[in-house]
Regions:
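A short, basic/flexible loop-to-alpha-helix module at the beginning of a structural domain
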Residues: 1-13
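N-terminal Rossmann NAD(P)H-binding glycine-rich loop of SDR-like oxidoreductase domains
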Residues: 18-33
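Conserved Rossmann-fold cofactor-binding substructure of NAD(P)-dependent oxidoreductases
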Residues: 65-85
Length: 160
């Protein structure tokens, strides 16, 4: 895909990237910067990755250290920035760890998605983009099942 095709949808927009310091989220942040987003808000619970991306991308990026599971904190962040687009990339993604910690997969992936999607709706965000995984197709792992639930939650929000 040519990024120039996407630029009209991003240029001049306020974009939020949950998990913006992670492997996928940081690539989204870099792309948004190249596409001339007006402001990019990284929401991440881990400051190291978020700090690195901010240093790389520059002043266009603002970092908020928060968990997507914390509804009140996320509500404050959404109210503060009023993003046009939310890219929800925050997730536990390592299958073996989630098999050992299924409740954490559900709390972080499912509850986090529910929180971010609810708030995107509350603040009239133009677009909510869920970053999922191939493991959500006919899931055989806790992580895959949790991400499938995230997809279904996102579809429910679209249909409302």
């Amino acid at each position: 895909m040519d990024l120039k095709d996407v630029q009209p949808y991003i240029e001049g927009k306020i974009c939020m990237v949950t998990g913006g310091g992670g492997s996928i989220g940081s690539e989204i942040v870099r792309s948004l910067s190249k596409l001339n987003a007006e402001k990019i808000v990284i929401v991440d619970i881990y400051e190291n990755g978020a700090y690195s991306v901010k240093c790389e991308v520059g002043d266009k990026v603002t970092v908020e250290i928060a968990s997507v599971r914390d509804y009140e904190k996320m509500d404050c962040i959404m109210n503060k920035y009023r993003p046009d687009i939310v890219f929800h990339a925050a997730a536990h993604k390592h299958v073996p760890f989630m098999e050992l910690n299924p409740e954490e997969a559900v709390k972080n992936n499912v509850k986090g998605t529910e929180t971010v999607a609810d708030l995107a709706e509350k603040y009239n965000t133009d677009n909510f983009v869920l970053i999922s995984t191939d493991k959500a197709v006919e899931p055989i792992s806790v992580m895959g099942a949790s991400k499938r639930c995230c997809e279904m939650l996102s579809l429910i929000h679209i249909s409302e």
